[in-house]
From Swiss-Prot:
This is Small ribosomal subunit protein uS19. It comes from Anaeromyxobacter dehalogenans (strain 2CP-C). Protein S19 forms a complex with S13 that binds strongly to the 16S ribosomal RNA. The keyword Signal does not apply. The gene is rpsS. Pfam families: Ribosomal_S19. GO terms for biological process: ribosomal small subunit assembly; translation.
Length: 98
């Protein structure tokens, strides 16, 4: 279920404070955060966030299209290595030939 409109978007206080400080000083340094749940606000556009994915920090450069989404959406937590059809076909024994 979506968040109520009357409540407004959620963003951690410490994260919004870091962005406001960066905007005041015109600094574009990487902002490190564990807050994957924070909604990307219009103030975040143009900044790079290092979002923690459980193992390492993934750099996320925020653009206008990302506003309204969560930071965690852009830092995947799982790595998919793919299904290998060739290995399965080679390992599977075929019918016995006479």
């Amino acid at each position: 279920m979506a968040r109520s409109i009357k409540k407004g978007p959620f963003a951690d206080k410490h994260l919004t404070k870091k962005v406001e400080d960066a905007n005041k000083g015109n600094k574009k340094s990487v902002i490190k955060t564990w807050s994957r749940r924070s909604t990307i606000l219009p103030d975040f556009v143009g900044h790079t966030f290092a979002v923690h994915n459980g193992r390492k920090f993934v750099p996320v450069f925020v653009t206008e299209n990302m506003v309204g989404h969560k930071l965690g959406e852009f830092a995947p937590t799982r790595t998919f290595h793919g299904h290998s059809a060739e290995k399965k076909a080679a390992a599977a024994p075929g019918p016995a030939k006479k």
